[in-house]
Amino acid sequence: MDERDLISRAQAGDATAFGQLLDSYYDTIFRFAWRWSRHRANAEDIAQLACLKLAGSLARYRFQAAFATWLYRLVISCAQDWKRSQQRHDHDDLYEGASLTDGSQSEDQIYLEQVLLELEDLGEGMKETALLVHAEGLSHAEAGEVLGVSESTISWRIHTIRRHMGKREARVSEGV
């Protein structure tokens, strides 16, 4: 059975088809949630929200975009909703779980977490753009479709991110 048939059957209420669809895409959902949040427990929460939202939203999928593109949008929305709910609960600790200084993370993990936090500070969509293009391997056009912006906007964001990271690396190498 091809993906379109599987989606159509799941939209019609076929629980087995929905389960197969979820099995096919769960790794993608979790991987993006983990890369976005950088903490397993948070990624599990986001993935769970995404699976629930998928169940409630699948009927609205109209095959106008690739299913994976539509699914990335859904996961990003869930991640942003999760972040807002965390901010309401605790303004001081955006990401529950391991802190930067608790010793449980490698230097690479700490560096990546710091970079992702800096990307959030650059403005809306920067973190998601970097993750979609560099971590998920989407083209600028595909990332633009997921985020609802033009390909040129994605290219500009990637340029801005690279420029910022170049300045960051210069500061790090100078010991600032």
Could you say what each language-model-derived stretch is?
Residues 9-20, 30-49, 151, 174-176:
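Short, charged helix-capping/linker segments at alpha-helix termini
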Residues 11-12, 35-38, 48-66, 85-87:
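Sigma70-family region 2
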Residues 76, 80, 126, 135, ...:
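DNA-recognition helix of helix-turn-helix
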Residues 56-63, 73-93, 108, 160:
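Arg/Lys-rich amphipathic alpha helix in sigma70-family domain 2
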Residues 22-40, 57, 119, 168-171:
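Amphipathic, Lys/Arg- and hydrophobic-enriched alpha-helical face
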Residues 12-15, 87, 99-131, 136-146:
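Amphipathic alpha-helical segment used for protein-protein interaction
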Residues 31, 45-52, 65-77:
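Structural recognition of an alpha-helix C-terminal capping motif at a helix-to-coil junction
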